[in-house]
Amino acid sequence: MGFASASREEKLKMMKTNKTRKTTKNLNRLAKKKKLSREIRDGMSDIKARKSADLRQRAVNIEDDFIADREARYENDDEEDLPLDMMDADIDWENSAFANAKRRLDRKRNGGADSDEDEDEDDVETKKRKFAGQLEEGHEELLPIKLKDGTLIRPTREKEVEEQEEEEKSDIDEGEEDEPHKEDFSHLSASELITKRRELLQEFKDTIASHANMLLANPQVNIVRLRDLYNLCNGEKVHSLVREPVQKLAMASTLQVLLDIVPGYAIREQTAEEKSQKQKKETRNLVNFEESLLRYHLKYLQLCEKLSNKLVGKDRHNDENTFTFKMGILSVKALARIVISAPHFNYSTNIISSLVRLSLAKNETVVKEVCDAIRTVFKELHLKITLFTSRSISTLVTKRKGRVSPELLKTLLSMNITEVANEDKKSGKDALIAKKYQIKKERASKTAKKYKKQLARLEADLLEVEAEESLTKKMKHATEAMKFAFQTYFSVLKRMPSSALLEPVLEGLSKFAHLLSIEFYEDIVSTMENMVQNENLKPLDQLHCINTVFVILSGDGQLLNIDPSKFYRLAYRVLNHFPFEKRPEQRKNQIVMAAKTLETMLVTRRKAVPLSRVAAFVKRLLSIATVLDDFPALCIVSLVRSLFIAHPKLSSMIEDEEGGAPGVFRQDIDDPDVANALASDVRDELSMLARRRNVELSRFANNILYGVPSTGIFKLNPQLSSLKPWILMGQLTDNAKEAYDRVETKYLDELEKTAKKRNQTVTPKNINFHISNWLTVAK
C-alpha cells in the first residue's frame, strides 16, 4: 500500500514515523559531534532505555507463556508408566530403525549389494525432516534472480568439497586409501630398492619444501600446512623405507618455519566473553591463525620433549649411532633454538624446565647441548627467563640433594648481572601524580603560560620516574635471579656431596660476592676460612675462597671485624703449586684467578697492606714466573708491574746499590710478613725473564727492571700496558699462531735437573730454594 492510497490515520502515522526517524538521526549525528547539551543526551538515553525495557518485557512474557504451556501439558498427560515386561515386549529390535541403519552401514563397509533395494518404509525415522524453503544437505543458495514479472528465482548448487578439512579430524580410516607406508617392496631387487628409496625421499623432500614455502609466503592462509609438517615429524603416512630421514628433515624444517612465523609477542588465549563477541573478518582470521599456530607449536614442543626424554633415565647410556639418540639430540637442539631465538613466545618457561631436567642425562653430548643453551639464555639478558632458569636450577639442586652435573652449576657463571636492586630506594611517582592533579585543580587561578610550563615540567619528571621504574623492575628480576643462584650455592656448600661441584660453586661465589646481602658476610667469610684450610682442596678452589673473602672485605664488608692476614698467608703459600699443574686450561684458570685475587689484595687494598708483605709477594711471583711458560709468565709480570706502580717504594728491589732492609730473606717461610723480602732484590728473576724469546714478555720484564719508565727505549705499548693482566694474557693467547693446548715444561725440567745433581727433588715446599740456586748458576 502506497502513501497516496492510505487512509488519513495511516498517513499521519507514516508521517510521524518518518519525522521521528529523521529527528533521531539528526540527534545522533549531533551527539557524535558533541554539540548536544547534557539534558538532551540524558533524555535520549531515557527514551532508548524505555524502548529496550519494553522489548525485554515482551521477551520475558513470551518465555513465561511458553513455560506455563509446557507445565500444563505435563500435568494433563494421563499416560502411565508401563511395567518392565511390557516395555521389553514392545521393542522389536530386528525391525527397528536402528537395526536397519546398522545393517546398511555394515553392508556399505563390507562392499555388499546395493542398499537401496532393502530399504524399508520404517527408515523414515532415521531421515532428517525437511521443511518448506529449506535447502537439501550438501547444497548452497546462490544470488536470487528477479524476472520481468517480479518473480524471484533462488538457484542452488552443490557445495564444493573444501580442500582444508577440520584440523582435529585428520585421522582417516586406514582401509579407505592406500597409504604409502603399506606398499610392499619385497619383490624389488637391491638396486631397485635403492632407486625406489631415492625417489621416495626426493618426493618427501619436495613435499616438505612446498609446505615450508607456502607457510613462509602466507602464514595466515596456509597455516594448515603446519599440521602436515607435524604429521611428517611423527612419520605418519611415510613408508618405513624412508621414515627415519623424512622425520629428521621434517623436524628441522618445522623448527625453522616456526621460528620464522612466530610473532614478536606472546599470544594470549581469548576469554569466553571475547569469543562470543562479534569480530571483523580480519580479526577473526588473525585469531584463527594465532590459535592454530599456538596449537601446533605446543604439539611440536611436546613431540620434542617426548623424544628428548628418551635420553634421560637410570642407566641410559645411549648409543649415539641409533635413530632414537639422533632424534633425541635433534629435539634437544630444537628446544634450545626456540628458547634462544624466541624467549618472549609462549611456553618458554616450559622449555627451560625441560632443558634443566635434561641436564641429568648420562650422555656428555646431551649435557653439553643443554648447558650451552642455558649459557646463551643467561648471556642474552632476558631477565625474566634468567630468573625462571635460575629458579629451576635451584629447585633441581635442592630436590636432587646436590646430585647434579657440575656443568649445570657452571652455567650460572654466565649471568650478566652486575648490580641488584636497592630495596631502600622508593619511587616518587605517586607524589608526582598527586602534584599533577593539584596543578590541574588550580588551573583557574593561574595564567595559561604558567600552567603550561608547570605541567610540562611535571610530565618530564613523570617520564623520568617511569623510566626508573622500568629499570627498577629489571633490577628486581636480577635480584631474584641472584637470590636463587646463591640459594643453589649455599645448598651445595651445606651438603658438599662431591668435590666436583665445589669448583663451580666457589667460582660463582667469587664472581658474585659483591652482590651478596650484608647479613651473609660473616657466615660466608667463616665458611671460606674453614674450607681453605682443607689440605685436599685444589689450588684453584683455594683461590676462589680467598677471592670471595677479599671481594667482601673490599666492599661493604670492610667494617667487619675480621683479620685478613691468614688469607694473605694462604695465598702466599698457594703460589708454589702453579708450576706443577700440567693441564693447560687448568693452569690458565689458576693464573687468571691468582691475578684477580692479588690485584684485590695488594692494589685495591694498598693503603691497608704493609710494604714488606707486598715485597714478599713480588719476590715469590717473579720467582715462580721464571719456571712457567711464556703466557702465564707474562700475566704475572704484568701484575708485578702494577704493584710497582701502586707501591713506588718497591723500587729498592731493582736498584743496584745496597740500601735495602737489614737481615736475610727467608724464602722457605710461607708467611709474607716475616720473610723479610725487602732485604732481597728481583734483578736476577727479571733478567732471566727478559731473555725469553717472547717479545712482549721481554719488554715487560725490561720495563720493570729499568724502573717502569713511560718514555725511552724501555717504554711499553700503551694499548698493552693499560690492559688488566688476565685480559692481556687472553688476547695474546687468542692471537697466537698455535693454540695454547699444552703446557711448556722445559724450564721446570731444567730446574729438576739442577736439583737432581744434588740428589734432591723439587716440591711445592722447596721450589723457591731450588729456583734461587738455579738462577745463581744460570747468571
UniProtKB/Swiss-Prot annotation:
Biased composition, class Acidic residues, residue ranges: 114-124, 161-178
Annotated keywords: Coiled coil, Nucleus
InterPro entries (UniProt xref): ARM-type_fold, CCAAT-binding_factor, Noc3_N, Nucleolar_cplx-assoc_3
Region feature (Disordered): 1-20, 100-189
Pfam families: CBF, NOC3p
Recorded GO CC terms: nucleolus
Coiled coil, from the record: 434-474
GO molecular function: chromatin binding
Predominant location: nucleus
Keyword Metal-binding: no
Entry's localization field: Nucleus, Nucleolus
Biased segments, Basic and acidic residues type: 136-160
GO terms classed as biological process: DNA replication initiation
Family, per entry: Belongs to the CBF/MAK21 family.
This protein's name: Nucleolar complex protein 3 homolog
Organism (species): Caenorhabditis briggsae
